[in-house]
């Protein structure tokens, strides 16, 4: 529905845009067709650099003369146009181009308005060479006849050079001028109007701070009002009100500031239903109207500029507007054009003119660091009189300085702390100082009149009666020759202006010196006085706090070129009040070492929700966050029905529903106790299924389950355990009895909490009453901090694009061993053809984390470099990056912040149109391999785990530990990944400990026994009946242990890394308890024992039929297994040697159908097979007995024979399929549940013991995890000093001997070898093709060297023998003969 409304608003904008507002297709180049006389400039450099050559793509370009202090290029479009873009080039084939410039526009050549980009920046970026065209599409279209370009910076290797292009289209203007006593009204053609969508649009300019611009109303409370209040534009709108509607319809929205600047401002209001857009000068504010109506019902008139006739009594306190209004559009009707044409439906009040008659005061804009204007005065007069008007945001600045004549001193007027301070210094006398005014830096015009003459001085501000300040003091006044406004030139010794005050930044006008008005036109053209760093005929003041860039209701204070945010009492800090001051939860306070008490928390961090106060119940292992409300006491309800129910709203202390919902959403667990008591009042039992009473939770969702029940079912707690008063109903209150009944319990589903309302609807009968009671919301844990994902194969996650407006903060943890990768990236639409906005955080190298972005000023990046370690060390590292209009910063772990201040007037609009990539750059470039967790953008946690997809290479959690664990989980323990470590889940085993290797056992005194019920008789009969109707497929019966039929499966063995399958189970189960066991086709039994007595029954499993299983000790001390599956028992002798030696023994028995696997102690595994006549199923198991069989009914005589006097010894690690009775008995918290207490019974003394069994692989348990580890305590004597010295000498002697043997071997091998001369030619490799042996030489052969005697040492493989030398060739005959003596060995 919301998207439909927004679409309709856009549609209405498009439809109405053609009626005087949008001008779609308005993209004509306007400079090219102009005559040369329409192009002017302040000066020109040469004949071919005049303004006429400043057209885009021209053969030259405009360049001012060298030394022009205020150069500008001016375009006269001959009539008013709508301007949408500006483009620049440098001068053709030169080094001359402009790098920064200011754009001024206006309807007259003596009144200019600076065009401000987003962020109130009046500076445009220009060119970087002489040929490329740089185009700026303006964020809103303005109308003007004259365009002026003021260069601010240019190529330092050249000079100013400019070619210009302006894009737009002709504009038809219909202007109405109001003098404060005028107004017009437009009457609808068909009387009253009723509309679902509306468009109001117009332009205005004024010098007044207050005035009514537009008003219309209806008889049912509908109205639309646009007015100026304090130079702010206010929109009041209502779609009507009614006594039966609870919500009022009035809505007020404010935009802009200092709108009384005699500049055109463009206003537009679009509405569709209750959704509306309010636009001022290109800044659009979307809001939703209050109330419940969607149509605007108006009477027959719209008033412009004020009220006419009887309508004045409705808005008697409003001032009429004084100024110009242009092109008033209402739903495609141009009311201003109809007024100019004197249409019959237009009513005039007063003399409304059809052209602007606003005054032109010729202001001066002071915006430079050393700006000033110097004008001459009339010297040696006895009366000094100065007056002027100024407006500014700055607290300080020099307004006026003048030297008195005859060396008598000087006079200073300065702005200090928002008031005008006067200082008169005279030679030989004490300085006179006094002040006047208050908060004069409010951005409005203020008039100053100062007069000083002999013995007294007077200053008045704004001609307020009684506000002038008169001072009597012995003064001698002689006026000087010069007056400096706005600052002092440098150097001061040359100009004679000596002041320590900073330059004034703001605007001045109507300068008067000694009673004469200064002609500023002469000053501008250097015919009077002097100036520097100022602009004439314009005032560049703007409201930098509108819109307010300070977040979370921070207060904005501005100066001429910047603003400051004050964040006191907001709960936030930082340059824009974006960073949260408080922690997210009580768990964070616990981890920081706090104690129980009241604390302020901020669950959404830097998000829009406000912080609030809660009570933190901080304990050793967790911290409960407690949020109280106004329903902590019982609420009585009578007289309610389903048609008119009682709505019990829950108002939480210090917090709204959204803020409490954010707390619950970020918590690991939440609970809230709800109790409903009734007297002759029903709760859920209705004929139509819709309940009488229910509760409302998060997001205003209705829930029909009550405390102690589960979501999705319409029941109370008693309906789950079938303990309701009426077994046929699901709640106690549904019995509808004339006595008090109660349904109560905990609500624990986090996504439904908190409870926001309780609705009661069945108390309107006689003697009917209901009461409900709700306890505080209690939460613990943080499920956002460990929202983790791992990237394995260069995958990426795609999220919706970032829409952060003016500030963005990103925080996350990463862990990797890869040297580089992109954590996240979001790209936007192109600024131009070759640039796109983006934001990216990446691991650039193993030692560098980079935050890179482009917000329109080019590529920027911040880098955190690590010298002491690498970031890819497979440890968790915290990254925090933030960007706003004031600065960008980056931090890794606890290293210092890396800061990058933003240029002044920077505008940031972090709204992107492409998906947000997490784990890589766009299109999966530069992927990250590793783990990410707790990724938050502006306080919102990204659900990384929810986007995990194993097929794409992303997995929930930071996996990898359980693949190759350092210490495996034994006895079927389940390995659980814990991001930076792992744990072993021992719930499905009979063991505990860190790796499921600690035995849990009990010592049985004589006569002690234990019974564990596997299922009740009623359940067994029902199960057996269903089993007979539909026999399940083998291997899929309940109780079947997965994995038995898997190839390579070894029954009874759970080696390192064994992992049982995960079973869905709500909450944490009772240790060792897994509910009833039905007909099974296999058993897995394991236990350990030690005893000195025989005979005894160690373990016995009975059934509701004659089937059983037993492990017993015979009289001779041997171990025997007995099975009865069907008719006859099966007996197997487990051991041939006695086991009654008091030592621990282990037994592992596994049966799969008719295959039996047995292992006792460390003997080899044996396999037995049952006869085909034996049944393969243990039917209807009933109970498990340990120590002794106390079963009723028929028992095998052999079992009775060994059953007396009972087992005496120790049993541990007992497990029958998925039941561990001893672990359940010793590890279940007391008191037990009724179901568990009924299932288990112990007779006699049973005390916990591990039966002397050592934990498995004790040596592999790391010492830091073993609580029983003690360091070695053996005495150590340092008596091995001489032994170490002797050993050192012995090793050195052996090494020397080995080296000597190698030297002797070398000498012996080379004894007869040396260098000698021969006349034999060298062999040529290409003279014997095919590898044939060469012929013997014709001359005498050289005697071969004697072969050395063989040694015992192994020799390396011999090198290939060289070919015999041939006779001297022609190349070797002329070589010089080198004779060498043989070296002596």
UniProtKB/Swiss-Prot annotation:
How does this protein lie in the membrane?
Single-pass type I membrane protein
Could you tell me which residues carry Phosphoserine? Answer: 1384
- Where composition is biased (Basic and acidic residues), the residues are 1319-1329
Please report the stretch or stretches of sequence annotated as the F5/8 type C domain.
Answer: 26-169
Which residue intervals are annotated with compositional bias (Pro residues) in the record?
A: 1334-1367
SUPFAM superfamilies reported for this sequence: Concanavalin A-like lectins/glucanases, EGF/Laminin, Fibrinogen C-terminal domain-like, Galactose-binding domain-like
Q: Which PROSITE patterns match?
A: EGF_3, FA58C_1, FA58C_2, FA58C_3, FIBRINOGEN_C_2, LAM_G_DOMAIN
Q: Where is the Laminin G-like domain?
A: 204-356, 390-539, 814-958, 1089-1251
- The residue ranges for the Extracellular side of the membrane come to 21-1284
Signal peptide span per the entry?
Answer: 1-20
Q: In which tissues is it expressed?
A: Expressed in brain. In myelinated nerve fibers predominantly found in paranodal axoglial junctions. In the internodal region of myelinated axons in the CNS and the PNS also found as a thin line apposing the inner mesaxon of the myelin sheath. In PNS neurons this line forms a circumferential ring that apposes the innermost aspect of Schmidt-Lanterman incisures.
Checking Pfam families in the record gives:
F5_F8_type_C, Laminin_G_2
What name does this protein carry?
Contactin-associated protein 1
User: What gene does this protein come from?
Assistant: Cntnap1
């Amino acid at each position: 529905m919301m998207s439909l409304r927004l679409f309709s608003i856009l549609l209405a904008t498009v439809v109405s845009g053609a009626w005087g507002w949008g001008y779609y297709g308005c993209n004509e180049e306007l400079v090219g067709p102009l005559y040369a006389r329409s192009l002017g400039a302040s000066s020109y450099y040469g004949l071919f650099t005049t303004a006429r050559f400043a057209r885009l793509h021209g053969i030259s370009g405009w360049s001012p003369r060298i030394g022009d202090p205020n150069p500008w290029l001016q375009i006269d479009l001959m009539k008013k146009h709508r301007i949408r873009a500006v483009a620049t080039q440098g001068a053709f084939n030169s080094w001359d181009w402009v790098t920064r410039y200011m754009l001024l526009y206006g309807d007259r050549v003596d009144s200019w308005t600076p065009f401000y980009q987003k962020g109130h920046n009046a500076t445009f970026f220009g060119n970087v060479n002489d040929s490329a065209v740089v185009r700026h599409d303006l964020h809103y279209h303005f109308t003007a006849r004259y365009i002026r370009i003021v260069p601010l910076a240019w190529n330092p290797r050249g000079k100013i050079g400019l070619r210009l292009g302006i894009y737009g289209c002709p504009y038809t203007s219909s202007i109405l001028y109001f003098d404060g006593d005028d107004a017009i009204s437009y009457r609808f053609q068909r009387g009253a109007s009723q509309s679902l969508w509306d468009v109001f649009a117009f332009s205005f300019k004024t010098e007044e701070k207050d005035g009514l611009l537009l008003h219309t109303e209806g008889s049912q409370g509908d109205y639309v009002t646009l007015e100026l209040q304090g130079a702010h534009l206010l929109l009041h709108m209502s779609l009507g009100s009614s006594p039966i509607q609870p919500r009022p319809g009035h809505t007020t929205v404010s935009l802009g500031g200092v709108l009384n600047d005699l500049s055109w401002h463009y206003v537009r209001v679009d509405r569709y239903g209750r959704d509306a857009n309010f636009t001022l000068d290109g800044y659009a504010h979307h809001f939703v109207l209050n109330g419940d109506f969607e149509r605007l019902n108006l009477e027959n008139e719209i008033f412009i500029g004020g009220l006419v006739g009887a309508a004045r009594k409705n808005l008697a306190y409003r001032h009429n507007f004084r100024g110009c209004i242009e092109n008033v559009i209402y739903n495609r009707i141009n009311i201003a054009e109809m007024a100019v044409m004197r249409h019959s439906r237009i009513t005039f009040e007063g003399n409304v003119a059809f052209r602007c008659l606003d005054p032109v005061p010729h202001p001066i804009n002071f915006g430079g660091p050393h700006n000033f204007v110097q004008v001459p005065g009339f010297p040696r007069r006895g009366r000094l009189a100065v007056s002027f008007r100024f407006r500014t945001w700055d607290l300080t600045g020099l307004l006026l300085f003048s030297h008195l004549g005859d060396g008598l001193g000087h006079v200073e007027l300065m702005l200090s702390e928002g008031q005008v301070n006067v200082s008169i210094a005279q030679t030989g006398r004490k300085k006179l100082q006094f002040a006047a005014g208050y908060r004069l830096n409010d951005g409005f015009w203020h008039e100053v009149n100062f007069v000083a003459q002999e013995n007294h001085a007077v200053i008045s501000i704004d001609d307020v009666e009684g506000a002038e300040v008169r001072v009597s003091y012995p003064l001698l006044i002689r006026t000087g020759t010069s007056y400096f406004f706005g600052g002092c030139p440098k150097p001061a010794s040359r100009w004679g202006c000596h002041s320590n005050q900073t330059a004034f930044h703001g605007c001045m006008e109507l300068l008067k010196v000694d009673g004469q008005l200064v002609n500023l036109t002469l000053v501008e053209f250097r015919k009077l006085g002097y100036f520097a760093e100022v602009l004439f005929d314009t005032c560049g003041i703007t409201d930098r706090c509108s819109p307010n860039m300070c977040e979370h209701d921070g207060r904005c204070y501005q100066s001429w070129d910047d603003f400051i945010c004050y964040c006191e009492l907001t709960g936030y800090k930082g340059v824009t009040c974006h960073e949260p001051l408080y922690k997210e939860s009580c768990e964070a306070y616990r981890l920081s070492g706090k104690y129980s008490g009241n604390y302020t928390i901020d669950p959404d961090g830097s998000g829009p929700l406000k912080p609030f106060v809660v009570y933190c119940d901080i304990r050793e292992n967790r911290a409960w966050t407690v949020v109280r409300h106004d329903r902590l006491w019982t609420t009585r309800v009578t007289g309610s029905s389903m048609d008119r129910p009682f709505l019990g709203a829950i108002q939480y202390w210090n917090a709204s529903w959204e803020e409490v919902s954010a707390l619950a959403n970020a918590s690991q667990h939440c609970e809230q106790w709800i109790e409903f008591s009734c007297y002759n009042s029903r709760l859920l039992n209705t004929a139509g299924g819709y309940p009488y009473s229910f509760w409302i939770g998060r997001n205003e969702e209705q829930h029909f389950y009550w405390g102690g029940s589960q979501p999705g079912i319409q029941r109370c707690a008693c309906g789950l355990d079938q303990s309701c008063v009426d077994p046929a109903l699901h709640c106690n209150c549904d019995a509808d009895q004339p006595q008090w009944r109660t349904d109560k319990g905990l609500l624990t589903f986090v996504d439904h909490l908190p409870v926001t309302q309780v609705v009661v609807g069945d108390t309107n009968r006689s003697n009917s009453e209901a009461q409900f009671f709700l306890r505080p919301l209690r939460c613990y844990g943080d499920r956002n901090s460990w929202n983790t994902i791992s990237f394995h194969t260069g995958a990426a996650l795609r999220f919706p694009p970032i829409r952060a407006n003016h500030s963005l903060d990103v925080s996350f943890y990463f862990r990797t061993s890869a040297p580089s990768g992109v954590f996240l990236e979001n790209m936007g639409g192109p600024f131009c053809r070759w640039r796109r906005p983006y934001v990216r955080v990446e691991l650039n190298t193993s030692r560098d984390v980079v935050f890179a972005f482009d917000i329109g000023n080019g590529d920027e990046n911040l880098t955190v470099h690590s010298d002491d370690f690498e970031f890819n060390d497979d440890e968790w590292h915290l990254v925090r990056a933030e960007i706003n209009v004031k600065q960008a910063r980056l931090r890794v772990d606890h290293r210092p912040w890396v800061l990058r201040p933003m240029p002044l007037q920077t505008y940031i609009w972090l709204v992107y149109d492409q998906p947000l990539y997490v784990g890589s750059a766009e299109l999966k470039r530069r992927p990250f391999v590793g783990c990410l967790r707790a990724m938050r953008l502006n306080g919102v946690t990204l659900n990384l785990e929810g986007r995990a997809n194993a097929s794409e290479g992303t997995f929930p959690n930071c996996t990898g530990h359980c693949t190759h664990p350092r210490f495996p989980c034994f006895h079927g323990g389940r390995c659980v990944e814990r991001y930076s470590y792992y744990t072993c889940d021992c719930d499905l085993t009979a063991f505990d400990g860190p790796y499921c290797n600690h035995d849990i056992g009990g010592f049985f005194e004589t006569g002690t026994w234990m019974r564990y019920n596997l299922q009740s008789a009623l359940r067994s009969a029902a199960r057996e009946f269903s089993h007979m109707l539909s026999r399940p497929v083998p291997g899929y019966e309940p109780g079947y242990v997965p994995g038995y039929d898997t190839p390579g499966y070894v029954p009874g063995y759970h080696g390192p890394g064994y992992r049982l399958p995960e079973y869905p189970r709500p909450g944490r189960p009772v240790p060792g308890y897994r509910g009833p066991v039905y007909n099974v086709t296999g058993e897995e039994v394991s236990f350990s024992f030690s005893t000195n007595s025989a005979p005894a029954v160690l373990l016995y499993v009975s059934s509701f039929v004659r089937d059983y299983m037993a492990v017993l000790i015979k009289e001779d001390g041997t171990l025997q297994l007995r099975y009865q599956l069907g008719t006859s028992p099966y007996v197997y002798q487990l051991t041939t040697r006695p086991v009654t030696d008091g030592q621990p023994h282990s037994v592992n028995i596994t049966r799969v159908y008719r295959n039996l696997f047995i292992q006792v102690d460390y003997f080899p595994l044996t396999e037995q097979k049952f006869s085909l006549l034996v049944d393969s199923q243990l039917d209807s198991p009933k109970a498990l007995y340990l120590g002794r069989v106390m079963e009723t009914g028929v028992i095998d005589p052999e079992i009775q024979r060994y059953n007396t006097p009972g087992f005496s010894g120790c049993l541990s690690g007992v497990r029958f399929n998925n039941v561990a009775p001893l672990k359940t008995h010793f590890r279940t918290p007391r008191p037990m549940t009724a179901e568990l207490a009924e299932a288990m019974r112990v007779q006699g003394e049973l005390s916990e013991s591990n039966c002397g069994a050592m934990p498995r692989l004790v040596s592999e348990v790391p010492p830091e995890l073993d609580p029983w580890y003690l360091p070695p305590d053996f005495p150590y004597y340092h008596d091995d000093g001489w032994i170490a010295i002797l050993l050192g000498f012995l090793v050195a002697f052996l090494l020397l001997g080995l080296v000597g043997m190698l030297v002797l071997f070398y000498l012996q091998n080379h004894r007869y070898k040396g260098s000698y001369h021969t006349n034999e030619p060298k062999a040529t490799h290409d003279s014997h093709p095919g590898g044939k042996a060469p012929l013997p030489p014709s001359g005498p052969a050289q005697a071969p060297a004697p072969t050395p005697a063989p040694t015992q040492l192994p020799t390396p493989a011999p090198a290939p023998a060289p070919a015999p030398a041939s006779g001297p060739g022609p190349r070797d005959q002329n070589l010089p003969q080198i004779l060498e003596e043989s070296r002596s060995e």
